């Protein structure tokens, strides 16, 4: 299977009418503000939607066209791709698109012009590649253990792919690691292949900041668009139980993301945040060309020493951007209007079309 040929994508794009572009996405994750932002910037919109899940897009009136499919993964089917291309569609990727379409399909046989860098999506999904990119950027990341037998302090254990925190757990010893792995296997939460690919890293205690950036090729600038923190089940409920009672409850903590809330960072920490974003863009341009174009997110913890430590990244629109569909504290400072991440993407597309530079932002 050969990779999608960029020249073929550009040929498809060349056949589009610049005055009749449709911004399209999969109906999940962050599609509401992607679609709404596109309409705000004057584009037609289309949503590829699983049957039975169309209500939000109808009731919020964000989609002009609906492509109904039996299951989300059908977005890669030839007939769906044909329909998207017939609308002059530019696809805006998000976490659900990556999960349902699948990286192999996105990289090898999805011939619809896509905003951003389709090659970098694998780098957020595979832990070793993600770590390589963050190391190249020179930002602080947790220490990684290559063998459970090496565990000598509290660690966080994660598994491949974007799972919204599902299956993550904390362990303080090799014995505890093995016990929790066995329990999760019995429950069917993970597979033997997951165990082989388990990512074990130093647990960072601190406060959570998920920092949302946008790198604009049009302006050659990294914009800090907003920040959020996450609601996680069941750990958020457990910590509300008195410590003496927690010990008596036979309930394993889990870290499944169930929601997001906006946050503002201490102002003296912002130089660190900007520096981290700049470093990530510079590193990505070197090792995953054309680079970190468009939205990306660094998921971080800030320690009591006021050091920001990055434990994960998203190389596309992150779910936390749903907290500022009307704009954030930070996007207001830069744009002076209600600028969601979806609208920022659409504006980049609009400016690129007006300046005849669409090939620079499409892969």
From Swiss-Prot:
Residues reported in the UniProt entry to bind Mg(2+): 299, 312
Gene Ontology MF: a single term: ATP binding
Cofactor note: Binds 1 Mg(2+) or Mn(2+) ion per subunit.
Binding site for ATP: 148-210, 232
Record's catalysed reaction(s): 5-amino-1-(5-phospho-beta-D-ribosyl)imidazole-4-carboxamide + formate + ATP = 5-formamido-1-(5-phospho-D-ribosyl)imidazole-4-carboxamide + ADP + phosphate
Necessary cofactors: Mg(2+); Mn(2+)
Residues that hold 5-amino-1-(5-phospho-beta-D-ribosyl)imidazole-4-carboxamide according to the record: 29, 96, 260
Keywords: ATP-binding, Ligase, Magnesium, Manganese, Metal-binding, Nucleotide-binding, Purine biosynthesis
Coiled-coil ranges from the UniProt annotation: none
NCBIfam families: PRK13278.1-5
Function: Catalyzes the ATP- and formate-dependent formylation of 5-aminoimidazole-4-carboxamide-1-beta-d-ribofuranosyl 5'-monophosphate (AICAR) to 5-formaminoimidazole-4-carboxamide-1-beta-d-ribofuranosyl 5'-monophosphate (FAICAR) in the absence of folates.
Annotated family: Belongs to the phosphohexose mutase family.
Name used for this protein in its record: 5-formaminoimidazole-4-carboxamide-1-(beta)-D-ribofuranosyl 5'-monophosphate synthetase
Protein source organism: Methanothermobacter thermautotrophicus (strain ATCC 29096 / DSM 1053 / JCM 10044 / NBRC 100330 / Delta H)
The organism's taxonomic lineage, starting at the top: Archaea, Methanobacteriati, Methanobacteriota, Methanomada group, Methanobacteria
């Amino acid at each position: 299977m050969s990779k999608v040929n960029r020249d073929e994508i550009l040929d498809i794009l060349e056949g589009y009418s610049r005055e009749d572009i449709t911004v399209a996405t999969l109906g999940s994750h962050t599609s509401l503000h992607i679609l709404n932002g596109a309409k705000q910037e004057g584009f037609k919109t289309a949503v590829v939607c699983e049957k039975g899940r169309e209500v939000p897009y109808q009731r919020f009136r964000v989609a002009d066209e609906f492509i109904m499919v039996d299951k989300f993964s059908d977005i890669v089917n030839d007939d769906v791709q044909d329909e998207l291309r017939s609308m002059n569609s530019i696809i805006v990727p998000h976490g659900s698109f990556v999960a349902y379409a699948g990286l192999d399909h996105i990289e090898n046989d999805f011939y619809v012009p896509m905003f951003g860098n389709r090659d970098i999506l694998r780098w957020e999904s595979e832990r070793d590649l993600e770590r390589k990119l963050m190391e190249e950027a020179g930002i602080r990341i947790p220490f990684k253990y290559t063998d459970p037998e090496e565990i000598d302090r509290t660690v966080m254990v994660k598994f491949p792919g974007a799972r919204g925190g599902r299956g993550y757990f904390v362990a303080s010893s090799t014995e505890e690691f093995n016990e929790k792995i066995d329990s999760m296997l019995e429950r069917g939460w993970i597979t033997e292949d997951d165990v082989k690919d388990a990512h074990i890293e130093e647990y960072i205690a601190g406060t959570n900041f998920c920092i949302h950036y946008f790198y604009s090729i049009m302006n050659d600038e990294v914009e800090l668009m907003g920040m959020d923190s996450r609601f996680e089940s069941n750990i958020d409920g457990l910590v509300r139980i008195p410590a003496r009672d927690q010990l008596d409850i036979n309930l394993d903590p889990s870290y499944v993301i169930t929601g997001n809330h906006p946050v503002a960072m201490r102002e003296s920490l912002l130089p660190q945040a900007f520096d981290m974003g700049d470093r990530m863009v510079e590193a990505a341009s070197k090792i995953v060309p054309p680079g970190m174009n468009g939205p990306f997110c660094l998921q971080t913890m800030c320690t009591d020493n006021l050091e920001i430590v990055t434990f994960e990244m998203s190389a596309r629109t992150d779910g936390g951007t749903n907290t500022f569909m009307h704009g954030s504290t930070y996007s207001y400072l830069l744009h002076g209007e209600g600028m969601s991440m979806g609208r920022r993407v659409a504006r980049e597309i609009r400016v690129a079309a007006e300046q005849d530079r669409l090939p620079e932002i499409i892969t």
